[in-house]
């Protein structure tokens, strides 16, 4: 593929709820643009974007994929993302380098949770937004209901560009509101036949066209005057207004069609090529501190942002990047601004699914891949200019689902750490550790499906078989009341002996660990032995009296004791403190603690009762309910015990204190 100038490059991120049809839309776009010679189908496991074995097996996207195509002289880098929240990390990576977001909506299901989270993400990333209402080959699809829901949820900036012609339950064609024509699409090629609008659809066409032009007029004062004066707004003025309105977020166009039959995809491609922004439209990029970095597409300084890493068992580490400044060329040597180390790029590729095509150069705003950058990870900046530049990193979600892992194959236990280390470079949302308490290997991910996929990748790529077992809960112990105690250590075996005597008061503490105080009078215990007493209590707290779990939240006061001029020493008072601990804690009403999480669930008003019921069934305790920023929604805050932190997808956890076990 030739090198494209910055002005002729569009980076479009496909977002939306799981199973809305993002990958099918990407396949239709690729096929119509002749980037592929067949229309891939998810049901047949032959799509360009879902090529991973697990994606084929599960019939859903797991990994984000880039798939470039050329349409009317414009290079469009289609970034296909997973729709399920377990794989949110990949979505965030693509959103970081996209210049616009296209949110795909199921024409039957309408606005779903994933639709709202996609919109919120695009807004947060300052991405221009469009909607594509999909699946109008299904008789149960309801365009007007879904469109009204989009306007209700996301505001009056949402405006129609196409609407379907519906005769009974059947879609007979589509109305282009800009050119005021009707289209009949060919499901074999994606081509369309342009016709005059049938008389029975004229009324609704005029109604929705007026809605479109009202949105267009609001982007410019001169157009507003023409609109209210009843003057015609030309097509050229409309296209420019849509372009500017999309960039500024004043217009959120809505397209419709059926991806698997390629209905509406050509008109979508036309709009992307004509009206979607190029990389330089925003003039600057953010650095890691939130400051603006000017974009210079033609300068001598080349800088790249590595947004994604893939651990390939054959190619090695694959680093996907966006050219943020200048032009990147093969065999360039750039500096990693995080490490200060030089990286030689070697060969540069553009990637379409699993296929790679070598290129010599890529212009500012384009997306490519380079292999075997050993010291580079996702969110790194590479440059031949100012080594202090650090582009704003991808903000990955916090993962909360933890499971123990065991090796299933002979010799696999020794290879688990190395295999997971490679996947950690690829997936920044997972973590791996060995528990100091249980000695259990623990893998943490966004959700159960996420962990299952990690296990499958270990097997498929590195031949490592693992199984999951429940995490051994890290219980703690504490006390609930005050108790007096005494400990005396005395040992005499000829020569110097050992003697230490302490009187202690134990009570519930306000801090997680030990709060140690002393109220010794008259020198009953010399001050130089106070640290030994404290150390003895701290060591004793490593093992509780109920089940041997560590003690937390303990206040210990040294109130008195006695000593011997010759036989007393630090070890004697340390051992005396341990004896006092063993004497006093059983009398202080000890209790077992289990971990809890504090969470907040944002949900529509209609579901708040169900959520509270589910929380109660899982031994949760509701802390309060408050209005959400979005109308018609509430925020339920609660604490949940142990594994109940996996209550719902989309739950956000904030703290992890401890609560008495039931």
Identify what each model region corresponds to.
Residues 1-662:
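Structural and coupling elements of P-loop NTPases
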């Amino acid at each position: 593929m030739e090198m494209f100038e910055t002005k002729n490059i569009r980076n479009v991120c496909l977002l939306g709820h799981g199973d809305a049809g993002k990958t099918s839309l990407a396949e239709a776009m690729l096929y119509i643009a002749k980037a592929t010679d067949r229309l891939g189908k998810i049901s047949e496991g032959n799509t360009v974007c879902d090529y991973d074995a697990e994606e084929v097996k599960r019939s859903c996207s797991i990994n984000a994929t880039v798939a470039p195509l050329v349409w009317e002289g414009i290079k469009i880098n289609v970034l296909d993302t997973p729709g399920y929240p377990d794989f949110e990390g990949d979505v965030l990576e693509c959103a970081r380098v996209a210049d616009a977001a296209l949110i795909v909506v199921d024409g039957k299901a309408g606005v779903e949770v994933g639709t709202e989270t996609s919109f919120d993400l695009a807004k947060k990333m300052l991405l221009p937004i469009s909607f594509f209402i999909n699946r109008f080959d299904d008789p149960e699809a309801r365009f007007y209901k879904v469109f009204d829901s989009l306007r209700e949820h996301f505001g009056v900036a949402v405006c129609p560009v196409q609407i379907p012609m519906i005769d009974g339950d059947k879609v007979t064609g589509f109305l282009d509101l800009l050119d005021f024509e009707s289209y009949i699409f060919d499901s074999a090629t994606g081509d369309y036949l342009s016709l005059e609008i049938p008389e029975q659809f004229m009324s609704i066409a005029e109604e929705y066209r007026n809605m479109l032009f009202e949105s267009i007029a609001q982007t410019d004062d001169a157009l507003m005057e023409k609109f209210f004066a009843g003057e015609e707004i030309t097509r050229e003025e409309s296209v420019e207004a849509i372009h500017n309105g999309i960039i500024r977020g004043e217009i959120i166009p809505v397209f419709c069609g059926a991806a698997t039959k390629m209905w509406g995809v050509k008109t979508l491609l036309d709009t992307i090529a004509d009206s979607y922004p190029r990389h330089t439209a925003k003039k600057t990029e953010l650095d890691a501190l939130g400051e603006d970095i000017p974009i210079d597409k033609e300068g001598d300084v080349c800088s790249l942002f590595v947004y994604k890493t893939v651990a390939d068992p054959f190619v090695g580490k694959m680093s996907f990047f966006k050219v943020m400044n200048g032009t990147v060329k093969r065999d360039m040597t750039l500096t990693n601004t995080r490490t200060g180390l030089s990286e030689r790029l070697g060969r540069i590729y553009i990637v379409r699914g699993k296929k790679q095509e070598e290129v010599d150069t890529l212009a500012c705003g384009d997306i490519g891949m380079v292999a075997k950058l050993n010291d580079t990870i996702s969110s790194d900046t590479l440059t031949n200019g100012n080594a202090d530049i650090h582009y704003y990193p991808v903000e990955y979600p916090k993962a909360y689902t933890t499971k123990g892992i065991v090796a299933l194959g002979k010799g696999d236990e020794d290879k688990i750490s190395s295999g997971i280390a490679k996947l950690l470079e690829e997936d920044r949302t997972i973590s791996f550790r060995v528990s100091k308490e249980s000695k259990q290997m623990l893998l943490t991910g966004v959700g159960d499906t996420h962990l299952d996929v990690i296990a499958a990748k270990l097997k498929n790529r590195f031949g490592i078989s693992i199984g999951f077992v429940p995490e051994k809960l890290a219980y703690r112990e504490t006390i609930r009341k005050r108790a007096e105690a005494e400990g005396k250590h005395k040992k005499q075996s000829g020569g110097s002996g050992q003697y230490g005597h302490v009187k202690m008061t134990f009570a519930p503490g306000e801090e997680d660990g030990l709060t140690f105080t002393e109220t010794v009078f008259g020198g009953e215990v010399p001050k130089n032995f106070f640290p030994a007493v404290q150390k003895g209590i701290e060591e004793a707290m490593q093992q509780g009296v109920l089940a041997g779990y560590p003690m937390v939240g303990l206040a210990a006061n040294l109130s008195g004791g006695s000593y011997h001029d010759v036989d007393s020493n630090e070890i004697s008072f340390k051992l005396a403190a341990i004896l006092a601990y063993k004497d006093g804690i059983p009398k202080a009403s000890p209790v077992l603690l289990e971990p809890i999480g504090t969470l907040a669930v944002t949900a529509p008003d209609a579901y708040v009762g169900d959520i509270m019921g589910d929380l109660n069934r899982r031994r949760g305790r509701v802390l309060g309910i408050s209005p959400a920023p979005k109308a018609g929604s509430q925020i339920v805050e609660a604490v949940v015990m142990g594994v109940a932190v996996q209550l719902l997808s989309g739950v956000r956890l904030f703290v992890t204190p401890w609560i008495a076990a039931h």
